């Protein structure tokens, strides 16, 4: 699109078609009739319990903060073009708990609580493991980049 070129068609707002092909339902905010309602619709979609992407991205960023690399290494490209998760079941499990859901209907975490998620991660065996490992030579041959988290990465 070239600035000032009005020959192009109007762009219709929508949500991520990879997740939902249906058109976005955008209604003006009731308390702001002069608003188009686009930002409100986006905010509601991002925080919707049916949106699986938001808790997965948030969990991945917090994991990246603690371990130096996210469960999805390309945390800025969290989709088909990025890398797949190194531990998809762990990412789903953490995201489900973070959003306040679990198999039993309740979660061990306070829903959407960053503090609870940080506590869960830093008290895990994975976080507390040593940077040295008695089986380091054998593990190094199997997983030289430590993608499987067999030891703690040294960070400054």
Where are these regions (language model features)?
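Primarily short, surface-exposed interaction patches in extracytoplasmic proteins
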Residues: 1-156
């Amino acid at each position: 699109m070239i600035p000032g070129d009005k020959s192009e068609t109007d762009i219709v707002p929508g949500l991520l078609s990879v997740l939902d092909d249906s058109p976005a339902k955008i209604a003006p905010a009731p308390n702001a009739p002069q608003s188009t309602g686009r930002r409100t619709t986006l905010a509601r979609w991002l925080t919707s319990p049916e949106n699986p992407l938001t808790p997965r991205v948030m969990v991945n960023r917090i994991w990246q903060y603690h371990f130096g690399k996210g469960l999805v290494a390309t945390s800025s490209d969290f989709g088909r073009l990025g890398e797949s998760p190194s531990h998809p079941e762990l990412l789903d499990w953490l995201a489900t708990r973070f959003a306040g859901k679990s198999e039993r209907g309740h979660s061990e975490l306070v829903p959407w609580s960053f503090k609870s998620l940080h506590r869960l991660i830093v008290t895990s065996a994975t976080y507390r493991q040593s940077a040295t490992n008695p089986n380091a030579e054998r593990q190094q041959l199997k997983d030289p980049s430590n993608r499987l988290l067999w030891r703690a990465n040294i960070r400054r």
